[in-house]
Amino acid sequence: MKILEQRIKKDGRVLGKDVLKVDSFLNHQVDPELMQAMGEEFATIFSDEKIDKIVTVESSGIAPAVFAGLALHVPVVFARKNKSLTLPENVWTADVYSFTKQTTNHIMIDHRFLSAAENILIIDDFLANGQAVEGLLKIANDANANVVGVGVVIEKTFQKGRQILDERGVRVESLARIKGFENDEVIFL
């Protein structure tokens, strides 16, 4: 998606050899017009699938997931990273390691919001090592839901996430695919 690649080149910041900071439009401050364009792009890409619900992980996956849900006219559910007093005991769970934060999160989705035979589209902000998506796949599997695909805003192809999902036979569609970083510049595929 050219508009996203241009925005990454303009406002993304490379930190070290494998971290891209996009907090000015995706991970801290959100550009709603860009999110709308991405949501519409996901809707076009997955127009051949019957989708009942979109699933993501809080918090950076929420904005692109909501705009994809708006474009597809389906609800969005996000896995919580922390159990609140209002969350019931009946939840689907998975442990997800965060490469960026160097912590493991115990993500959860209320049983009421994910059911057997629902067709699920997973949307996430980044695909790097694939941990967040793996956690959501586990939750969907535990709920006997059908994952029709994974939509990723930014994929770091030099990390193993895509390979893991390909080996599992999961359809993955990315809006921007990064080959690597050179001299603090993003190199796209």
From Swiss-Prot:
Annotated keywords: Cytoplasm, Glycosyltransferase, Purine salvage, Transferase
Q: What processes does the entry annotate via GO biological process terms? A: purine ribonucleoside salvage; xanthine metabolic process; XMP salvage
Question: Where does the UniProt annotation place the signal sequence?
Answer: none
Name where it's found: Cytoplasm
Q: Which reaction does it catalyse?
A: XMP + diphosphate = xanthine + 5-phospho-alpha-D-ribose 1-diphosphate
Its quaternary organisation is:
Homodimer.
Role summary: Converts the preformed base xanthine, a product of nucleic acid breakdown, to xanthosine 5'-monophosphate (XMP), so it can be reused for RNA or DNA synthesis.
According to UniProt, the name of this protein is Xanthine phosphoribosyltransferase
